[in-house]
Amino acid sequence: MKETETKKEYDPLVNYHEILGVTPEMIDWFWDNMEKAYYLWAPDEHVSFVWEIPPNQNGHVGAIHIVREVEPPMPEKTLRMRFESPKACPIPLIYSHAVVIGRLAPDAPAVGGEPISYTMHEYEESPTGTRMRSTYMLEKGWTDGAREALSNHNKRESLGFPRFLPQLYQLYQVIKNPKLNVPCCLKYDSKTLEYNK
């Protein structure tokens, strides 16, 4: 690091969830097939979804999606997010599956642009379904109200998975075309921090 560069400081927000009746494999599948279920995940808060770079084009890492959502009582916002490698994760991962998401500025390059902040959803099988830890590495300056709104939104999303994901995942098992039903495994090697093939 050059003397003129400063290490980015983050302000973490962490939630733990128990997701009943949903397997880690279903959640893996969800991330690369979000266009099928984004609105079901948080029906009153998710407004729009589009892939800028879909995962069926070059794989999971590097795929970019743009969403509009509301985190009440905060106003609607647009987020541009890129799936990152577990190696990019700014915190130690503790569960066996992980999706690492970098939030990009609207004008950041698709490849190589430094994320503004990171979101990590890590999860593993539990006796009742899946246990998950959601960590938001937020840029400094978030108000207490904005942090609480994001935390509550995240909890509602996690509670939403059992409502739709097992049924949707099962329905899509008949579609064998990987362009339409994108296979996704986000289990990673704890030593190399690379996704398993």
Predicted features along the sequence, with ranges:
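Generic structural hydrophobic/aromatic packing signal, biased to beta-strands
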Residues: 41, 65-67, 123, 132, ...
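Glycine-rich portal/gate segments that line the openings of hydrophobic small-molecule binding cavities
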Residues: 39, 46-110
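A conserved amphipathic terminal alpha-helix motif
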Residues: 136-196
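Hydrophobic/aromatic beta-strand elements that line small-molecule binding cavities or substrate pockets
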Residues: 17, 80-89, 116-125
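Hydrophobic ligand-binding cavity/cleft-lining segments
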Residues: 1-60
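Beta-strand/loop substructures that line and gate deep hydrophobic ligand-binding cavities in soluble
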Residues: 97-159
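Amphipathic/hydrophobic helical signal segments and adjacent flexible N-terminal regions
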Residues: 1-5, 185, 197
